[in-house]
């Protein structure tokens, strides 16, 4: 948590998990993570972007994941939107890097304009977990030094 993530599929995974965590405990999501990984085909953006109504129904019937219609639709739509960003910027990570650094409100506005089901808390936690904003670990935490050695985007200002 807080380490930089540069792989697009892993970034997508974090976004989907953050979206699904909304209103629930992280423990619930972590217990279902394996199911999410299988259900969303290892969060392969290209594959999820091709999901059909049949795939949506499959996901909504999968007791191993969060079966919320808005969250399932958001995962599929956001995969399609990330594909568009990959075409325009080369990768989702490159799109994030192209906008860095922004303050939290600016990131939230950008995500709201670009994606669906991305409220302020979801965006903040996504950016925190992937190393785009500081605060995942206190400086006194042993993990903080490990995070810093990986040069997360927030440390490169």
Map each language-model feature to its residues:
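HhH-family (HhH-GPD) DNA N-glycosylase catalytic core used in base-excision repair
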Residues: 1-157
């Amino acid at each position: 948590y807080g380490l930089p993530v540069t792989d697009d599929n892993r970034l997508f995974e974090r976004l989907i998990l953050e979206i699904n965590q909304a209103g629930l405990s992280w423990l619930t999501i972590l217990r279902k993570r394996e199911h999410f990984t299988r259900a969303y085909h290892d969060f392969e953006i290209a594959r999820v972007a091709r999901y059909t109504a049949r795939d949506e129904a499959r996901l909504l019937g999968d007791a191993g994941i969060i079966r919320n219609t808005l969250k399932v639709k958001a995962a599929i739509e956001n995969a399609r939107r990330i594909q568009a960003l990959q075409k325009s910027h080369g990768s989702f990570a490159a799109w994030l890097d192209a906008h860095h650094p922004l303050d939290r409100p600016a990131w939230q506005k950008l995500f709201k304009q670009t994606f669906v089901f991305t409220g302020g808390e979801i965006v903040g936690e996504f950016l925190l977990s992937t190393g785009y904003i500081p605060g995942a670990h206190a400086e006194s935490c042993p993990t903080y030094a490990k995070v810093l050695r990986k040069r997360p985007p927030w440390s490169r200002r």
